[in-house]
């Protein structure tokens, strides 16, 4: 069976739309009140995903290994998730608002080897509600975790397994591009691509297994409903731990090569929509 892989779509975009905008975050306001943006082109974003993939390969991240991302939407969320797809690993989204007990369950149940720690813009300024504080409380209960990556601007965790984003990217400097491409070439349609955890209304959340073929089938159905053209604006606000967030913001985004604008807080989505005009 032939399917369209998201990693191949990303590499295609890096070639066809190298200097076109892929992802933007608000950088501030100009003197006239207009918004200023920090933007990555498709080539820049693709290069970052390849760099993350190399770091994963350097630390022994194998086919089927899991990476949990405990953060709200931000550029590194997309590049880390993209790297799990590129290395034939498995992406596991963890809601940025999850309690320590909920985080422990999802990361432990998934058997995640790598954990990415970001921020929670809905913490209300309470440091105890930040992912780094919450994760630090349960790290010792997660024997499968081998590496904890602290994203820029996030409170560090004092633990031997915790490293900065910069140091993490340095890990893969000696890995060749060919090793990454070899991983992509080895992906089969029924290889596991993601674990999406349910809400856990009647018990502990359960990880729904989605393969590369599942994503391709979902994208084909979306194509029947809506057509998105290269370069059109899109606003990302739904948490990426949500299945629809992953479908559109990680997979459809690359397939259609649209220009994604990432909100800094889900509560600000209306303001972003007014400015971006998606």
List where the protein language model places each region.
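Conserved AMP-binding A3 loop
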Residues: 39-43, 193-219
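Conserved pre-ATP/AMP-binding loop-to-beta segment of ANL
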Residues: 19-21, 150, 162-166, 173-197, ...
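Structural core segment of the AMP-binding/adenylate-forming
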Residues: 10, 86-170
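Conserved S/T- and glycine-rich ATP-binding loop of Class I adenylate-forming
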Residues: 67, 84, 115, 192, ...
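A short N-terminal helical cap/helix-turn-helix that marks the beginning
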Residues: 2-28, 47
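Conserved AMP-binding/adenylation subdomain of ANL enzymes
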Residues: 88, 216-233, 240-278
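A short helix-loop-beta submotif of the ANL/AMP-binding
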Residues: 23, 66, 72-100, 105-114, ...
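Conserved AMP-binding/adenylate-forming core of the ANL superfamily
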Residues: 23-82, 99-104, 164-173, 210-212
């Amino acid at each position: 069976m032939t399917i369209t892989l998201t990693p191949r779509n990303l590499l295609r975009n890096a070639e066809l739309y190298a200097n076109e905008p892929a992802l933007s975050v608000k950088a501030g306001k100009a003197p006239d009140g207009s918004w200023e943006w920090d933007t990555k082109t498709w080539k820049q974003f693709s290069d970052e995903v390849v760099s993350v993939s190399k770091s994963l390969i350097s630390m022994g991240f194998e086919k089927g290994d899991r990476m949990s991302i405990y953060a709200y939407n931000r550029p590194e969320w997309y590049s880390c998730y993209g790297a799990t797809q590129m290395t034939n690993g498995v992406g596991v989204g963890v809601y940025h608002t999850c309690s320590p007990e909920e985080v422990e369950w999802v990361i432990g149940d998934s058997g995640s080897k790598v954990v990415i720690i970001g921020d929670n813009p809905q913490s209300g300024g309470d440091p105890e509600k930040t992912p780094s504080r919450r994760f630090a409380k349960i790290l010792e209960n997660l024997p499968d975790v081998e590496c904890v990556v602290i994203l820029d601007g996030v409170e560090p965790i004092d633990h031997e397994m915790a490293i900065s984003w910069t140091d993490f990217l340095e890990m893969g400097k000696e890995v060749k591009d060919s090793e990454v491409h070899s991983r992509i070439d080895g992906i089969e349609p029924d290889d596991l691509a993601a674990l999406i955890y349910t809400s856990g209304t009647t018990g502990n959340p359960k990880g729904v297994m989605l393969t590369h073929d599942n994503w391709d089938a979902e994208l084909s159905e979306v194509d029947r409903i809506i057509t998105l053209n290269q370069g059109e604006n899109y606003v990302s606000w739904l948490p990426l731990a949500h299945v629809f967030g992953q479908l559109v913001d990680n997979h459809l985004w690359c397939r259609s090569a649209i220009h994604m604008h990432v909100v800094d807080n889900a509560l600000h989505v209306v303001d972003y929509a007014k400015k971006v005009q998606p």
